[in-house]
Regions:
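Single conserved hydrophobic/aromatic residue that forms the stacking wall/gate
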Residues: 1-9, 13
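Small/polar loops that bind or transfer phosphate-bearing groups
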Residues: 5, 17-20, 88-92, 113-114
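Active-site-proximal catalytic alpha-helix in oxidoreductases
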Residues: 10, 57-62, 118-127
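NAD(P)-binding Rossmann-fold cofactor-contacting core
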Residues: 14-36
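Short, charged, surface-exposed secondary-structure boundary motifs
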Residues: 25-28, 70, 121-124
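Rossmann-like adenosine-cofactor binding region
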Residues: 38-111
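Adenosine-phosphate binding glycine-rich loop
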Residues: 91-154
Length: 154
């Protein structure tokens, strides 16, 4: 719901929120729309993904589907869905290149994992707890260490 909330404040586009349980999608969309006093988040059943209007949309995969050791699992396995995407972000970082990301990349699009999100959540917490600021250079060094530790070669 955080991703929905942060994107819902913008006046540019509507967002389709797909969930395997339509009731959950409706509840999240209602809460986000009420918070921002708009109707930018549209709840949808994940089975209706082909009904997403337009093309060149950003897809953010926020489930645990595809998380190690289930590396080859994916929520939507239809190439047509990925053809319409402009870019994909998978919150998972292990494996570093999920099946979701592979399907996005197979269409010649960019795909990103959740490692930087994990890093910057940690940086924010560290700064808050220790009343300090971490430089971009320091964060970049930690990112490189995380990549090395996880065997990620980007």
């Amino acid at each position: 719901s955080t991703l929905s909330s942060s994107s819902a404040a913008s006046d540019v586009y509507k967002r389709q929120l797909l969930n395997r349980t339509v009731d959950k999608a409706e509840a999240i969309a209602q809460a986000v729309n009420a918070h921002f006093n708009n109707d930018k988040v549209i709840p949808m059943n994940i089975a209706d993904y082909a009904d997403i209007p337009g093309e060149d949309y950003v897809v953010i995969q926020t489930t645990s589907v595809g998380l190690h050791p289930n590396d080859e699992a994916v929520v939507i396995d239809d190439e047509a869905f990925y053809k319409k995407a402009a870019v994909g972000v998978d919150i998972i970082y292990n494996p570093a290149n999920t099946k979701f990301m592979k399907l996005i990349k197979a269409q010649g699009k960019n795909a990103y994992n959740g490692l930087k999100m994990l890093l910057y959540q940690g940086v924010s917490a560290y700064e808050l707890w220790n009343d300090c600021k971490i430089t971009k250079e320091e964060a970049d060094e930690v990112y490189k260490c995380l990549q090395k530790e996880l065997g990620i070669d980007e």
